[in-house]
């Protein structure tokens, strides 16, 4: 009898899970975990397009800073969008801000959300612990998505019981400006989950592209080796960083040279990605560490955000 009961419960659980993954979700309520530039940007565009948002981080001070940054960003948007109607611009800002709540307790706010977007530190253990905890409190239909730029989505999803409702949703900084979103589908991600995230991305006014769960996805898989090759060109003394930047802007039509872009993105971010790829595939020459990059990061010279990287900033 006990065996029959167990089999029945497994059948019910399996059927319930299949039902949840088979349904296409229209995302209305979004929980964003992480109040940094990326998380705040995602919260802003979601709220500005009619979604209710809860922004989560560890302290009220961080959240207050995030909310202030969102307000400043929204006012810039309103100034352009409502240049001839300042009152409408103010109303847009206030209405958008009113749909963004904040919390320091993620578990308490995911019970009724349609989508959780994680944008925290690029650390697999930390992400796994977060999603494992949220998995216990989130509604059955809730989709989980990670904004990771360097970790495998499958490795993060494995911490949960909803691999079919787990995918990557990779935005680009600054989120309110950059139009692209990479939607990452793992072997376990259901088609309905994928379609729900594509629709959500479009609702944000973004252009979604699809990619399998491969290291770096599309943009970083092509961009990071290009940046690293520019560094190696400079390290060999083949050309100065200034001339390399000028060549790529005037010769290839790029808006920024590789060293300008490295400093803008953050040298610590690039090093983290390269180190992760090197660990996975040490023999690949494209993933070899750079002495110059390592030295600058060790000296806490991360680029524009610290005032110095490959270039110095006032």
UniProtKB/Swiss-Prot annotation:
CoA binds at residues 73, 80, 149. Residues 1-12 form a transit peptide. The modification N6-succinyllysine is found at residues 80-81, 87, 136, 185, 192, 202, 206, 212, 241, 312. It comes from the Eukaryota. Pfam families: 3HCDH, 3HCDH_N. It is an enzyme of class 1 (oxidoreductase). Pathway: Lipid metabolism; fatty acid beta-oxidation. The modification N6-acetyllysine is found at residues 81, 87, 125, 136, 179, 185, 192, 202, 212, 241, 312. InterPro entries: 3-OHacyl-CoA_DH, 3-OHacyl-CoA_DH_CS, 3-OHacyl-CoA_DH_NAD-bd, 3HC_DH_C, 6-PGluconate_DH-like_C_sf, 6PGD_dom2, Mito_3-hydroxyacyl-CoA_DH, NAD(P)-bd_dom_sf. GO terms for biological process: cell differentiation; fatty acid beta-oxidation; negative regulation of insulin secretion; positive regulation of cold-induced thermogenesis; regulation of insulin secretion; response to activity; response to insulin; response to xenobiotic stimulus. This is Hydroxyacyl-coenzyme A dehydrogenase, mitochondrial. It comes from Homo sapiens.
């Amino acid at each position: 009898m006990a065996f029959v009961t167990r089999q029945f419960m497994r059948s019910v659980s399996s059927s319930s899970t299949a039902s949840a993954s088979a349904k296409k979700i229209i995302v209305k309520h979004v929980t964003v975990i992480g109040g940094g530039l990326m998380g705040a940007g995602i919260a802003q565009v979601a709220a500005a397009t009619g979604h209710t948002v809860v922004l989560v981080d560890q302290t009220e001070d961080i959240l207050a800073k995030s909310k202030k940054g969102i307000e400043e960003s929204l006012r810039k948007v309103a100034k352009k969008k409502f240049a001839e109607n300042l009152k409408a611009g103010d109303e847009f800002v206030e209405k958008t801000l009113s749909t963004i709540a904040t919390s320091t307790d993620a578990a308490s706010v995911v019970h009724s959300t349609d989508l959780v977007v994680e944008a925290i530190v690029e650390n697999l253990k930390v992400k796994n612990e977060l999603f494992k905890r949220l998995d216990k409190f989130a509604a059955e239909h809730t989709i989980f998505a990670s904004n990771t730029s360097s970790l495998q989505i499958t490795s993060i999803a494995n911490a949960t019981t909803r691999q079919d409702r787990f995918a990557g949703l990779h935005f680009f900084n600054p989120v309110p400006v950059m139009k692209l979103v990479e939607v990452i589908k793992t072997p376990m991600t259901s088609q309905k989950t994928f379609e729900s995230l594509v629709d959500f991305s479009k609702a944000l006014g973004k252009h979604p592209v699809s990619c399998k769960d491969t290291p770096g996805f599309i943009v970083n898989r092509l961009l990071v080796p290009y940046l690293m090759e520019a560094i190696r060109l400079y390290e060999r003394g083949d050309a100065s960083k200034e001339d390399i930047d000028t060549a790529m802007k005037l010769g290839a039509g790029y808006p920024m040279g590789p060293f300008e872009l490295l400093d803008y993105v953050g040298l610590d971010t690039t090093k983290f990605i390269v180190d992760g790829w090197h660990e996975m595939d040490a023999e690949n020459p494209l993933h070899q560490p750079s002495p110059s990059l390592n030295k600058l990061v060790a000296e806490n010279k991360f680029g524009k955000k610290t005032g110095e990287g490959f270039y110095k900033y006032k």
